[in-house]
Amino acid sequence: DYCCRRPPCTLIC
């Protein structure tokens, strides 16, 4: 999985 947003990650692609 890839973090779509910068930390803190609230959305996972």
From Swiss-Prot:
Per its record, what are the GO molecular function terms? acetylcholine receptor inhibitor activity; ion channel regulator activity; toxin activity
Q: What is its main location?
A: secreted
Q: Which GO terms describe its cellular component?
A: extracellular region; host cell postsynaptic membrane
Q: In which tissues is it expressed?
A: Expressed by the venom duct.
What function is annotated for this protein? Alpha-conotoxins act on postsynaptic membranes, they bind to the nicotinic acetylcholine receptors (nAChR) and thus inhibit them.
* Organism of this sequence: Conus regius
Per the record, the coiled-coil ranges are: none
Task: Give each disulfide bond as a residue pair.
Answer: 3-9, 4-13
What are the Cysteine amide sites (modified residues) in this protein? 13
About its domains, the entry says: The cysteine framework is I (CC-C-C). Alpha4/3 pattern.
Q: What is this protein called?
A: Alpha-conotoxin-like Reg1f
